[in-house]
Amino acid sequence: MKLSTTALVLATALLFSGCSHKEVYKPEEVKGEWRNAGHLSASISQTTHSAALLDNGRLLTKDGEKNIKIPEEYRLVNANDSWVITESPEGNLVLFPEDGTDAKVTFELKRHIAAANVQDDTVAILFTNNEMALYSLESKKLLFKESANTPIAVDARIANPYFLKELVLFLTLDGKIVIVNSETKQVLRSVVVSSEEYFNNITYLNVIDNNLVASTGTSVLALSQKEAREKYEIRNIAYTAEGIWIATKQGEIIALSPSLQFKAKKKFPFAHFVGLSVQNDRVYALEQEGYMIALTKNLLAYDVYDIDMDSDNKIFLGDGRFYFDDRYINIK
């Protein structure tokens, strides 16, 4: 019995010592330091794909800081050219005008909100139980409701509803794109991006030149005249008219055509990418340990730079900038 106990203690010690040793990315050569371009008024506290909140309540959009303050304990959901979309601690949807005026709009829903967006008089909401709804901004009346499968577990990177003229694209928590006509209030089509059991919500969507690209954590879809799907373990994705670039959990940068045809791949052992952007003729991959990897679009050449960044910094991708902590760097 004593021997068994000793063996168990030894095995446990070995297990924990093995788990505590984490491999990290170490570049073979660093070209130099990528200097900070400027500072924010406070550190980043919340991030979404479209905007971020600072510790002092100020809003950070892709264009930079705005003279808008969001109340403490509110959760940032989304931001567009007209509205800053938030959730209050009581579960209400609260819209703040993007121009900084005081004419806020409150929807007393008393429900947990996963994602939301606003266009003209249409407010599109995805609730955390995967229910989709359309409301009138002016009257606050419910115009449309559609239920879906309640997810077991989701990725924190939840994509907001997307407006395409009169169409509303709900990006569900179970890996589907549900297309609703906002005028007729009818579901026109449902497209499956991925069918994994866990963490299957859509994390990204963009439409360029009538080609739709959407992804979950495990799959990417391209939809134009035809549908194409490919499986990747996706950390970050960037999409332009020239192609798609993916940073994977395996430390790879992968280049695809807009229709998902494979073009190139470059692997960086143990790299944990936290941001990806395509600017001009370069692909910029931000690595968690404080490195900027600048690659040519064909991934045949690259340079690595040091960045003054901590591994636990919250990251926000702006227009030609990476924001982290209370500062930013330019990549244009």
Locate each region found by the language model.
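Sec-dependent bacterial lipoprotein signal peptides
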Residues: 1-21
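Bacterial Sec signal peptide processing site at the extreme N-terminus
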Residues: 15-36
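A short beta-strand motif characteristic of beta-propeller blades
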Residues: 32-34, 63-73, 101-108, 141-153, ...
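Repeated scaffold domains used in trafficking and secretory/extracellular systems
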Residues: 35-48, 69-83, 108-121, 152-162, ...
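Loop/turn residues immediately N-terminal
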Residues: 55-60, 89-94, 129-133, 174-177, ...
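Hydrophobic/aromatic beta-strand positions that recur at structurally equivalent sites within the blades
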Residues: 60-63, 95-98, 135-137, 180, ...
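Acidic, serine/threonine- and glycine-rich low-complexity intrinsically disordered segments
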Residues: 140, 145-146, 152-258
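Hydrophilic extracytoplasmic domains
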Residues: 241-332
